[in-house]
Every structure is written in C-alpha cells, then in structure tokens.
Amino acid sequence: RRQLLEPAVQPNAAHVALARLEQKFTGDCLLVTQNVDDLHERGGSSDVLHLHGEIFKARSSKNEALLYELGDQDIYAGDLCEQGDQLRPHIVWFGEDVPMYPIAHDITQTADLVIVVGTSLKVQPASFLASAAPYHVARIVVDPKAEADVPAFYLRHPAGEIMPSLVDYLLQQGMEDLSGLDQLAPQQKN
C-alpha cells in the first residue's frame, strides 16, 4: 500500500485511455477491476467497481457497509469503527467471497461490448465475467498471455501499449464496427 503512494506510481496509458472511453460514454460505461489500487481513478475514471475492494479504505470487520477512507494511515489492532468493531482493510482476502461479483455479473449480462484488459482469464471468479455477457455481445481481450478460453477478439499486447489505439478506434469507428481491430498496432514508446 505504501508503494502505491510513491510519486513514481502513476496511471499508465491504459488507465488514461479507459477513462477517455468512459468520458465519451458517460453513464453507459462501467469499469470493473480486480485491482485494489486507485490507478483507474487517478487516470480519470469515476465509474469504477472494485471487485476485490480498495486498499486505501478500511471497513468494519463485522459490518461491510461501514467504510472509511484511509489515505496514508495504517490500521492497527485496536482501531475500531463507530460500532466498536475492529477495522480491517477493505479488500477481499484469499478464501473470502467476492461481494461485488454478483453486481458485476448482472451488469455484464446487459453489456453491449465487453473489453477485458490485463488478465489472462485464469483468475476466478472475475474471469467468468468475460463469459457472462450474452452470446451476441462482442468481447475484446487485451493481454499478451491471454488464452482463447472465451469467444473474443484477442489483442495480445501489453495494455499500456495497445489500449490508446483501441480506444481511439472505438471512439472513431463506434462500438459496432470491430472489423478493423486486427489492424491495430501498439503505440510506439518514445
């Protein structure tokens, strides 16, 4: 968590590109992330659903609805919520249920387009979201190591390199015409 507060840790080009897409389709675009950091928000996104929680927040150990902004503060034994229960990081620990998954699943079932970025589709249950959209809905998977486990158009490039081009394409061509995706090339690094 402390490392995320370092000035060198900044959103990459993929975070910024996704924010551009959200800004164009305000109210119709939801970013679902497995990441517990705030890089999407710092990149400009505002409609973000954190499947595994948020590392800069704390919550009651008994009442998940009691959330508190942590910022750069640490949590110690004896730090209590207003109801007297121990505070804990607002993240999903190994073996715990993912409480935001049903919400993400329901939203995915009404999607017009699903873009999966930065995952090889091996982490469950989040990888199931790529399959949750109706069969006719186009899916784009962006990850150099993604395996063809779901019917999708695969862009096997690092997200920070290809997402700006993908978002430019979607903003220019629209969400319906994906025929030119195979022509996309990663942005050149300077």
Regions found by a protein language model. Give the residues of each.
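Conserved catalytic alpha/beta core of Sir2/sirtuin-type deacylases, generalized to analogous enzyme cores
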Residues: 1-190
